Regions:
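N-terminal alpha-helical interaction modules that lie
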Residues: 1-129, 133-139, 148, 159, ...
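TPR/TPR-like (Sel1-like) alpha-helical repeat modules
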Residues: 33-34, 193-211
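Short coil/turn linkers that connect adjacent helices within long alpha-helical scaffolds
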Residues: 39, 111-115, 166-170, 208-214
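Amphipathic alpha-helical protein-interaction segments enriched in hydrophobic
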Residues: 119-126, 169-184, 219-232
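Hydrophobic/aromatic-rich effector regions of fungal transcription factors
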Residues: 130-135, 177-189
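Alpha-helical adaptor scaffolds
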Residues: 133, 137-173
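Alpha-helical repeat scaffolds
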Residues: 152, 194-202, 246-252
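Short conserved catalytic/interaction loops centered on acidic-Pro-aromatic/His motifs
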Residues: 169-175, 188-198
Length: 264
């Protein structure tokens, strides 16, 4: 391995990323990972996961569009239904393949070189998010596979959550993990109350810490995006949590009262 080899691969990865050639960007960063035996710089990591994010999110958006169209085709008993379903299944496989490739890189290469908690939190967030993405696109009948992935996602998220106390309340990796974990709880696990409580707690702690510190402008911008997403979710979820609490209260009122047996 020479410095020129590394510089050349990084240069090509940069060019590909700027040109929107995300498959090629991943390929060159993979080669860098091999040259360094799993080690990776912050820039290379950003190039790698930015490319995975673009490739995966583009297909997730396409999947949602086709899924909505498929519902219409089913309703209209269209002769094109098999083709539309075929497109959706192809997208499902593409998303799963990209995710499996990314997780394989994390588990087999990147995690072996991690020596700080922030990176461990980051990788646990990415793995948890990717499990959530697969759960979202699996058919309803794949209940067993979904349940297994829910357990895996919970496990991945909790690895990072257990390390969160070692990071500052204004650490964007920490806040990002907590934000995405609450989305997982709300949308996948249907645990509305816990999602709301964690989101609100994260929002309050972050806002309190912001007032106490002078932040770098770039950090402030990143943090501001996360805080606004938390705020939006808290606002959207509050009505559901309120309704759930009311339903629970009504159920308690309707339950039979305990009657003590009369003394003899």
């Amino acid at each position: 391995m020479t410095e020129k080899e590394i510089d050349d691969k990084l240069y090509l990865a940069r060019i590909c990323h700027l040109s929107g050639l995300h498959e090629e960007t991943i390929k060159y960063v993979e080669e860098l990972i091999k040259l360094r035996n799993g080690d990776i710089t912050e820039e290379e990591r950003n190039l790698l996961f930015s490319s995975f994010k673009t490739l995966i999110n583009f297909r997730r958006d396409s999947w949602r569009t086709i899924n909505a169209l498929e519902s219409k085709e089913i309703k209209n008993q269209s002769s094109l239904l098999p083709r539309v379903t075929g497109l959706k299944l192809s997208l499902t496989e593409e998303i799963k393949n990209y995710i499996n490739k990314a997780i394989e890189l994390i588990d087999n290469n990147l995690l072996k070189k991690v020596n700080n908690n922030e990176l461990k939190v980051l990788y646990s967030k990415i793995k948890g998010d990717y499990m959530r993405y697969i759960i979202e696109i699996l058919p309803k009948e794949n209940e067993e596979e979904k349940n297994a992935l829910k357990e895996k996602a919970e496990e991945d998220y909790k690895i990072g959550l257990n390390l969160c106390d070692t990071l500052n309340n204004l650490n964007t990796t920490k806040v990002g993990l907590l934000l995405n974990y609450t989305v997982f709880l709300y949308e996948i696990m249907k645990d509305y109350k816990t999602a709301y409580v964690i989101a609100n707690d994260t929002y309050q702690k972050t806002m309190k810490s912001v007032k106490d510190e002078n932040l770098d402008l770039n950090v402030f911008k990143d943090l501001n995006k996360l805080v606004n997403l938390l705020k939006d979710n808290i606002s959207k979820w509050s009505e559901t949590v309120k309704q759930e609490n009311n339903d629970n209260a009504e159920n308690e009122e309707l339950s039979p009262e305990k009657v003590d047996s009369p003394s003899s």
